Amino acid sequence: MSQSNIVRLDSRSNAQAAWQTLCSRADLVANSGVVAWHDGAQVALFHLPDNADGEQLFAIENRDPKSGANVIGRGIVGSLKGELVIASPLYKQHFRLADGSCLEYPEQRLQVWPVRLIGDEVQIAAG
């Protein structure tokens, strides 16, 4: 599996990963973030139902690397330089949703997880 956390939403199997249900589709907020616990980490989930590339779901670390605060799930989703990004609500740095890299500060990076929607379940790759 690549470093990207983009998984086709109609994908039902992946021999490389074991999937764990994290929450339900009803828990998601369109074009915004919600936060869930996964293996001791806070994971911010961003659901983009009407994106130009089709419905997409991203799972990215909730902890801002500059401040140490768990606030990424409260950030603003947007597009910058052709990339889908989340802007940290504190210092306004932009992180790519696809791979967690920071556009302004290359040394900052957020962890990402493969994630998918199967029916009404949001599943995240375990391990």
Show which residues each predicted segment covers:
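N-terminal pre-ligand scaffold of iron-sulfur
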Residues: 1-83, 96-97, 109-127
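Active-site loop/oxyanion-hole signature of alpha/beta-hydrolase fold enzymes
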Residues: 106
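Short cysteine clusters
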Residues: 64, 88-91
